[in-house]
Design a protein with these regions (language model features):
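Compositionally biased, charged N-terminal/linker segments
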Residues: 1-40, 136-149
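An acidic- and aromatic-residue-enriched active-site/binding cleft used to recognize and process polar
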Residues: 43, 49, 68-71
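Surface-exposed, flexible loop/turn segments at secondary-structure boundaries
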Residues: 14, 52, 74
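Short His-Asn-centered micro-motif
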Residues: 10, 47-48
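Hydrophobic beta-strand signal
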Residues: 45-46, 63
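Short, charged beta-turn/beta-strand-edge "cap" motif at the junction between a beta-strand
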Residues: 48-54
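Aromatic- and Lys/Arg-enriched surface recognition patch
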Residues: 58-129
Length: 149
């Protein structure tokens, strides 16, 4: 089995709620390529910069945490003209966690003044497990739950 990887997806809080309810993730306006980078067993943290995709109200929090539970991306016809790609995710019960107090300690944020820059791409790998551990230590208050990550 390949090495477990850790990912962040930037998704509005509103869309995150839909994904959690349906046990799926959709990123980068439905593109397949980013989803294909994940493998079954990888972990995913969702960061929501805004409450809704159309609005401007800030959220700036990690809003969901889960594990990839399928083998590949699949298409899903949402409307007659929009068929995005998705991955199935086993989401964990967790607490929404503000990014603000974590910025200085997250290694993937190299420029602390422009801390939002990495999230503009919509999807990226967390290269250092300590960053994933820091985020999940705030999202999962239950010590037992953290043992399974």
């Amino acid at each position: 089995m390949s090495e477990v990887k850790y990912w962040i997806a930037s998704i509005s809080k509103e869309h995150t709620k839909r994904g959690v309810a349906g046990n799926f993730i959709q990123v980068c306006r439905g593109k397949q390529a980013p989803l294909n980078r994940m493998k079954k067993g990888d972990y995913l943290v969702v960061y929501s910069s805004k409450l809704s995709m159309e609005g401007n109200e800030k959220c700036q929090a990690f809003t969901a945490l889960g594990k990839v539970s399928d083998d590949e991306a699949y298409s899903f016809q949402m409307t007659e003209s929009f068929t995005p790609f998705r991955r199935n995710i086993e989401f964990f019960e967790c607490e929404e966690t503000s990014i603000i107090p974590l910025i200085n300690d997250l290694g993937f944020i190299s420029n602390k003044k422009s801390w939002g820059y990495p999230f503009r791409f919509g999807f990226f790998e967390i290269k250092e497990k300590k960053d994933f551990d820091l985020i999940t230590s705030k999202m999962l208050k239950d010590e037992i739950a953290r043992q399974y990550l």
